[in-house]
Amino acid sequence: MPRIIIKGGVWRNTEDEILKAAVMKYGKNQWSRIASLLHRKSAKQCKARWYEWLDPSIKKTEWSREEDEKLLHLAKLMPTQWRTIAPLIGRTAAQCLERYEYLLDQAQAKEGDKDEGDDPRKLRPGEIDPNPETKPARPDPIDMDEDELEMLSEARARLANTQGKKAKRKAREKQLEEARRLAALQKRRELRAAGIDIRKHRKKKRGVDYNAEIPFEKKPASGFYDTSDENLPDYQPDFKRLRQDHLEGKMRDEIEQQERKKDKERMKKKKESDLPGAVMQINKMNNPDHVKKRSKLVLPKPQISDGELEEIVKMGYASEVARASVENGGQASDALLSEYSVTPAINKALRTPRTPAEQDTVLQEAQNILALSNVDTPLKGGLNTPMHESDFQGVTPRQQAIQTPNMLLSTPYRTPGEGSGSTPRQGMTPRGAIGTPSQRSVRDKLNINPEDAVMEEYESECAAKQQQSEAKEQLLAGLASLPAPSNDFEIVLPETPAEASEEHKPMDFVEDAADIDERALALRAKQEELERRRRSQAVQRELPRPSNVNTSVLRPTNVEPPLSALQMAEELIKKEMIVMLRNDIINHPTSQQIESLTNKKTRNAAQAVITGNRAALERDPMENFTDEELSSAKNLLRQEMDFVKSKMAHSDLPLEAYSKVWEECYAQVLFLPSQQRYTRAAMASKKDRLESLEKRLELNRYQMTEDAKKAAKIEKKLKVLLGGYQTRAVGLTKQLSDLHEQLEQSQVEMTTFQALRNQELQAIPKRLEALKEDVQRQTEREKQLQAQYSELLYERDSLLSKLQI
């Protein structure tokens, strides 16, 4: 018995891919041909699968609240018309129906009429899905059946065959048509060669012949026009920059990781080449003094100045005194002298109002639809089905705008209006305790507000006039009940001493931390600058200093004959110089000293030098001088220099002489690489001189190499920056040379034509004379011929007359 296959069932991933490829090849109208590739699916199922799931235009994202509201409203307007509702929402009909049933189930579950576990949409074991076209595809098994493999191979072969029977037939027909055209053309050529002209008379078509004419042709105007703007530059794409990573760009994490890696490599190289510099850089980074300074707190200017505050206080004090003087004056006095300084209802609890509750429109609409679906027959009568009120005025629901209550309009320190949160009008005053008993009270007791602001509070002009008249009558009645005036005056003197004493009191405010830090940093910087000025000039200018102190420059004190006063002064200067050098070695080491301390080979020797200098400095400490003493010493030295200069008649030393002396002194100093120290050139041997010169040559070569590398980098950078300008400069230079050649050629031509013009001007009179002579000669010749002609004519006439006689 043959195997019977019922088409349908769950769609698999392989079938979906075959269906996509078939739609790409055959289009969306040949579903029978597409279904022939799928043995288990019919044409109708393939079409439904495409339009319900595989179409790229299908929206498969989560349903939004607006879409749910729109779906429920349209379902209430057009029940069961899912094909009509689907394009309005932007979903498929199956998606709309499934979502609609889900919302109804949710509404029933909300009311408690249905168990959440009892969902009819869930398939039970053994049931078949009635709509498999709207479900995701099932993944392919690892071991596929033979019929599935056969179907896959056949579909792959058919879809890969772009030269089928139809394509071959079309190619063959095209070749036959071309051969037929060539044969007809050859026949017409042979007949034309034989003298038989057979022209093809084409039948005139009604309308426009698109093969012979150009529809909507707009012929250009006659003349020459500049078309250089139409010459587009040749597009030369840089394929290296068209890669995906260049188009998308790098992520920020990748860039940060690369920069960190570069920083690590740079720091590693710096530690290998310049360890002291790296240590100093790390110490500088870890130094809290170099932390980024916080910006100063800038507050806005006060809206009320101190003078205005004083005026307000004085006005309040005056009003309080006036109220105290008429404290027992009655109700009329209280109404006239209302207290404007205190806003009513200031002691109410300050509480932020809550946002109004939001209604669940989707749930309400679902419950309305459930209620309508469960309505009994209207023949029984009774009340209508209770439903929630919906606010739909069209196809789409109206959005519920939720606004946060304005606290500024309902705070107790603002003027209260008709309701809490109402915007106060311009010129309003506080509501007093006593008001006119009417529909709307007049809060302007001292006629401060303008009339327009008062008139705006009433609905009509008549009501405003009536209210004003009532207020006027009440005011007149209150004035009539006033007591007799008393001539008691109280003068209050300003308390200037108290204010003056208060001005001298320190202001009780908390200083900003940023200002404190800034002042501390400024003070620290000032102290560092003062300390730097007290150091030696070699440290201040960062000049090279010796790594050890040579005490052999001192002379022994117990010598015969004893030292003179000048020599003793010189020894004191040397001694002070040695103390200063030791202090600089310990407290202000150079980069070479730091490098020797970090180097394992020279660490012990450098540490021993520092220890010895520290011990010597403890025995003979350096004396600290004040700034005044240092400045006075500098002044004494300057005066002594000026005195010696004037007595010795020395002039100012020119720069050339100074440079010459400096070069001579510098030539006497020689660096010994083997001993790592400087010495005089006269005291060094020939071998030491050669080593020193070799070392200097090596340093010069190294410096030259570094300069060459820097120059190459700068040249490369400038080539990148100025390459386009250089190319343009070459082009402009070539254009300039061409223009210069054209100018020279034009000048030569102009000179030639000028010479030719001069020659022509000289030859014109001669030519005119020659032409005049020719004309005169021709005129005379014509006269002679005319005379001869007249004679011959006369002779002919005479002969004819004789013949007639």
UniProtKB/Swiss-Prot annotation:
Compositionally skewed regions (Basic and acidic residues) per UniProt: 108-127, 246-274
Pfam families, sorted: Myb_Cef, Myb_DNA-bind_6
Main localisation: nucleus
Entry coiled-coil feature ranges: 142-193, 511-542, 678-804
Domain annotation HTH myb-type: ranges: 1-58, 59-108
Compartments reported by the entry: Nucleus; Cytoplasm
InterPro entries, A to Z: CDC5L/Cef1 (IPR047242), Cdc5p/Cef1_C (IPR021786), Homeodomain-like_sf (IPR009057), Myb_dom (IPR017930), SANT/Myb (IPR001005), SANT_CDC5L_II (IPR047240)
Disordered: annotated segments: 108-143, 246-293, 409-442, 530-556
GO biological process, one term: regulation of transcription by RNA polymerase II
Record's keyword terms, sorted: Cell cycle, Coiled coil, Cytoplasm, DNA damage, DNA repair, DNA-binding, mRNA processing, mRNA splicing, Nucleus, Repeat, RNA-binding, Spliceosome
Keyword Chaperone: no
Highest taxon, organism lineage: Eukaryota
Residue ranges of the TM segments: none
Gene Ontology MF annotations: DNA-binding transcription factor activity, RNA polymerase II-specific; RNA binding; RNA polymerase II transcription regulatory region sequence-specific DNA binding
GO cellular component, one term: spliceosomal complex
DNA-binding region in chain numbering: 31-54, 82-104
Keyword DNA repair: yes
Similarity field: Belongs to the CEF1 family.
Function recorded in the entry: DNA-binding protein involved in cell cycle control. May act as a transcription activator. Plays a role in pre-mRNA splicing as core component of precatalytic, catalytic and postcatalytic spliceosomal complexes. May also play a role in the response to DNA damage (DDR).
Subunit structure: Component of the precatalytic, catalytic and postcatalytic spliceosome complexes.
Protein name: Cell division cycle 5-related protein
Native organism: Nematostella vectensis (Starlet sea anemone)
Gene expressing this chain: cdc5l
